[in-house]
């Protein structure tokens, strides 16, 4: 238990343990995109990144973004560049460069991403092929997913959600088990 008597001792231990110190720093500065915000894409496919998400990006010092189609759902995913690089490093570390199938997996993973930048007004351009893949025409919904942001077409986001009862049961099942190791991103 943390109290004023042992606080100094705990920080002395943290100071000697670079891994623990790194993990504490990581926990304090990690990005948190939360909530859902509706927006509109213009005729060119430009859309404003919601101000709350821009503030999180600016606070992290990472304003470069990577955009790709979600692997499992009909939405797009915006990654801050630092998070994207971590994902690439994890995937590359698990794949064998000398295995043809694994090279194809990596090639497809990195070839389906595009760097996007915010203009002076806080907008970014969603390329036409991504608009088509996600079914985005005009109405857009941003959903903060912690370290990434999902971009959905109009009402498609709601269709992907569970009912309240189903969500409660799923969450109960997950929380009743031991947590997985923290090595995944």
For the regions a protein language model found, what residue spans apply to each?
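Flexible "stalk/tail and boundary" regions
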Residues: 1-36, 43-44, 53-121, 129-185
